[in-house]
Swiss-Prot record:
It comes from the Bacteria. Keywords: ATP-binding, Nucleotide-binding, Transferase. Residues 2-226 form the ABC transporter domain. It catalyses: methylphosphonate + ATP = alpha-D-ribose 1-methylphosphonate 5-triphosphate + adenine. The keyword Nucleotide-binding applies. Belongs to the ABC transporter superfamily. PROSITE patterns: ABC_TRANSPORTER_1, ABC_TRANSPORTER_2. This is Alpha-D-ribose 1-methylphosphonate 5-triphosphate synthase subunit PhnL. Together with PhnG, PhnH and PhnI is required for the transfer of the ribose triphosphate moiety from ATP to methyl phosphonate. InterPro entries: AAA+_ATPase (IPR003593), ABC_transporter-like_ATP-bd (IPR003439), ABC_transporter-like_CS (IPR017871), CP_lyase_PhnL (IPR012701), P-loop_NTPase (IPR027417).
C-alpha cells in the first residue's frame, strides 16, 4: 500500500542566512495492508517530516513515495495537485490532535464532511458521525455546537472522529492520543485496531509507550539514514 524509496529532504532556513537543515537522508519504508508501522526516533530524527511527506504536505528533494490508489500506484513526489486532492479524498486519511475548522460549523458537520465529500447520503454520514462521537465520549449536547467553543480535549476527539469517518485504505496518525486520558486513548486504540482489521495500512507517531505497544506491528527506526 505504501512504498517509500530513498527519500531525502533538506530544509533551507531563509531567515537564518540560508542555513541548510538535512532531515531525511535516503529514507525508505514499506507498509502493507492491515499493518500499523510506528515511526520511532528522537526529536529531530525526521518522523514528522516523513509522515507529512506521505500526505504530500512536504515535497522531498529526491526519492519516490508510491501509494496504492484504487488500482494504480501513484508517486506523490511527482503527482499533480489535482491527483493529490483526489487521493486525500478517498485513499489517504490524516488524523492528528489538532482541529482547524470554520468557527460556526457544528461538530456533527465537521465530522461527517469528509464522508459527504465521497458521495455518501447525508443521513448515513450523520449516523456514522454520531456513532464515532459517542464512542469518543463527546456528549450529544455538544454535537450541534461549534467545536471552536469546546475544550482542547473535546476538539481533539472531534478531530479523531473526523479522521476515522471514511474507511481510508491508508491512515496517517500524528500523535492522535496526545493529552487524552486513559478512557479516550483506549477508544482511539480500538478504532485503530478496527482499521487494521479491515485492511488499512497505517503509519503513526506515538510518544505514549502504552498506546504504541498496543497498536504497532513493528517500529520503524528513524535517524540520519532512515
Amino acid at each position: 500500500m505504501i512504498n517509500v524509496q530513498n527519500v531525502s529532504k533538506t530544509f533551507i532556513l531563509h531567515q537564518q542566512n540560508g542555513v541548510r537543515l538535512p532531515v531525511l537522508n535516503r529514507a525508505s519504508l514499506t507498509v502493507n495492508a492491515g499493518e500499523c508501522v510506528v515511526l520511532h526516533g528522537h526529536s529531530g530524527s525526521g518522523k514528522s517530516t516523513l509522515l507529512r511527506s506521505l500526505y504530500a504536505n512536504y515535497l522531498p528533494d529526491e526519492g519516490q513515495i508510491q501509494i496504492k490508489h484504487g488500482d494504480e500506484w501513484v508517486d506523490l513526489v511527482t503527482a499533480p495537485a489535482r491527483k493529490v486532492v483526489e487521493i486525500r479524498k478517498t485513499t489517504v486519511g490524516w488524523v492528528s490532535q489538532f482541529l482547524r475548522v470554520i468557527p460556526r460549523i457544528s461538530a456533527l458537520e465537521v465530522v461527517m464532511q469528509p464522508l459527504l465529500d465521497t458521495g455518501v447520503p447525508r443521513e448515513a454520514c450523520a449516523a456514522k458521525a454520531a456513532r464515532l462521537l459517542t464512542r469518543l465520549n463527546v456528549p450529544e449536547r455538544l454535537w450541534h455546537l461549534a467545536p471552536s467553543t469546546f475544550s482542547g480535549g473535546e476538539q481533539q476527539r472531534v478531530n479523531i472522529a473526523r479522521g476515522f469517518i471514511v474507511d481510508y485504505p491508508i491512515l496517517l496518525l500524528d500523535e492522535p492520543t496526545a493529552s487524552l486520558d486513559a478512557k479516550n486513548s483506549a477508544a482511539v486504540v480500538e478504532l485503530i485496531r478496527e482499521a487494521k482489521t479491515r485492511g488499512a495500512a497505517i503509519v503513526g507517531i506515538f510518544h505514549d509507550e502504552a498506546v504504541r505497544n498496543d497498536v504497532a506491528d513493528r517500529l520503524h527506526p528513524m535517524g540520519a539514514s532512515s
